[in-house]
Design a protein with these regions (language model features):
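Non-catalytic, mostly N-terminal accessory regions of nucleic-acid modification and defense proteins
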Residues: 1-254
Length: 254
């Protein structure tokens, strides 16, 4: 499907992409509406399993704030259409916490939503970047940050398999991906005085172009979820990307 930007009526109010209801235009609502569309266009989640502003229960009681207002998850993705229609907290796949651009808080809220529902994980986004978490396994309590949000029907447990180039999904919201990449690199480079963010972005893009345009069934610009969890795996992926950039640069020495 094509990416749909935020819809507004003639009065400047937001038209909810899920229900058609009229909503107040706020920075946070814009982030939420855009991410609902990204879930569909880039990750393949059907519209009929996505819900906006869902009350979160603790046992049989709906959680509330200090002032008595219901606590609601910004976006909930259910396991099925039926679960979404019934707002079945026992069949939630993951939850999303949305914040206005440049905000950094909200992790503790996301944790609360995940552990009070059946969710296997959750997403935090401020529209400029995204962090994805899943529940720890093996009896441990807590969350692990994972590399990327699984697409619809993909396994949240991660995989060592690498898809062929022909199987790679085509992103629709490239601006969001570039913004996320920028923010990850910025966070990594803040402690390095010699870090050149713009050039690192360019090097990564050129390495990706080299990988996409050279023969070979499988991508080299790739890291598996299991490799991402180890320093050795991340180092190997970084080395391969550096090789790709050098291959590109050698073709255009000037």
């Amino acid at each position: 499907m094509e990416l749909i930007e935020v819809n507004f009526n003639d009065e400047g109010d937001i038209i909810d992409t899920l229900s058609g209801k009229i909503l107040k235009d706020t920075p946070e609502e814009r982030v939420r509406q855009r991410f609902i569309n990204i879930l569909q266009s880039d990750y393949g989640y059907p519209k009929n399993i996505i819900a906006r502003e869902v009350p979160v229960q603790q046992g049989s009681k709906i959680l509330s704030s200090d002032d008595g207002a219901e606590i609601r998850a910004d976006i909930v993705v259910y396991t099925s259409k039926k679960a979404c229609l019934e707002r079945d907290q026992g069949n939630i796949l993951f939850v999303v916490e949305c914040k206005k651009p440049n905000a950094t808080e909200g992790y503790s809220q996301l944790v609360s939503y995940i552990f009070n529902t059946s969710a296997v994980g959750g997403v935090w986004t401020n529209g400029n970047g995204i962090s994805v978490y899943k529940k720890k396994t093996g009896g441990e309590v807590g969350l692990d940050e994972i590399l990327t949000l699984p697409r619809y029907r993909e396994n949240w447990s991660g995989s060592d398999s690498i898809p062929s180039k022909s199987e790679l999904p085509r992103p629709h919201n490239v601006r969001f991906l570039l913004s996320s990449c920028h923010n990850k690199l910025y966070g990594r480079g803040m402690e390095n005085e010699d870090f050149d963010l713009a050039m690192d972005m360019v090097r990564n893009l050129l390495a990706k172009i080299q990988d996409e345009t050279t023969p070979g069934e499988f991508p080299r610009f790739w890291i598996t979820e299991n490799d991402f969890q180890t320093a050795e795996g991340r180092k190997h992926a970084a080395t391969e990307i550096q090789k790709l950039f050098r291959e590109y640069a050698d073709q255009f020495p000037d």
